[in-house]
Amino acid sequence: MTTVFMLHRVADYDAWRRVYDSFADAQRQGGVTSQAVYRSETDSNTVLVMHAFGSSEEAHSFLERPDLREAMQDAGVDVGSLRPEFYAEA
């Protein structure tokens, strides 16, 4: 199992969350088995997203999807702030 943590800034959390929630079916189809969203206690527009996948290949493939990049842009993600980190279950 691989878990991806993505720290990033968004222009407006509420607008971002609507787009994120509307992408749930694509997440499942892309291999996401579990997800969670966290907000910074000091900056409500800084979010940490956790997605779990069955394999590293699924995780990398999901993050390369053009529709994911498009959804991120539509949601107001500051793509320059993206910090994906991949972790394997120990």
Give, region by region, the residue ranges found by the protein language model.
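Short S/T/G/P-rich N-terminal loop/turn motif that feeds into the first structured element of a domain
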Residues: 1-70, 74-90
